[in-house]
Amino acid sequence: MSRKNRAPKRDVLPDPLYNSQLVTRLINRVMLDGKRGTAASIVYGAFEQIKEATGNDALEVFETAMENIMPVLEVRARRVGGSNYQVPVEVRPERRTTLGLRWLVTIARLRGEHTMQDRLAKEILDAANNTGAAVKKREDTHRMAEANRAFAHFRW
């Protein structure tokens, strides 16, 4: 175990265009090799595509998509008496957001569209409509937690 104190959480500044911390966190998640400008243009371009496709505010569509992706339950391994049990636990709010963003970007990168901007826009639209691989990932996580409900009394 580390002897040092836990590092304090840093505040994320809201992005200049949408004034949202969630969008800033998405940009940080998309960013590779410290290229924030490139990541920002990808995210803002995807938001423009979403606005054109739906006619609604892109931020609202994104927030709906995030609500559909973020897990409520997950399983954690717990060793009891020589065997490992998958124990279902509730996901803390901060971790919910982190997992949602991570799944969204990871799955968008795996999509087949030509540019990352297209992939991200399509995945956000799919998630907002409760379809797509990111929502499936959440459902699988919930299904796993439900299947292991019998071990919920091992919660710590």
Curated annotation (Swiss-Prot):
Keywords, alphabetical: Ribonucleoprotein, Ribosomal protein, RNA-binding, rRNA-binding, tRNA-binding
GO CC terms, sorted: cytosolic small ribosomal subunit; ribosome
UniProt-listed InterPro entries: Ribosomal_uS7, Ribosomal_uS7_bac/org-type, Ribosomal_uS7_CS, Ribosomal_uS7_dom, Ribosomal_uS7_dom_sf
Any one GO molecular-function label of the UniProt entry: mRNA binding
Statement: the UniProt record of this protein carries the keyword Membrane: no
Gene3D superfamilies linked to this entry: Ribosomal protein S7 domain (1.10.455.10)
NCBIfam families (UniProt xref): rpsG_bact
Assembly: Part of the 30S ribosomal subunit. Contacts proteins S9 and S11.
Family that this chain belongs to: Belongs to the universal ribosomal protein uS7 family.
Protein name per UniProt: Small ribosomal subunit protein uS7
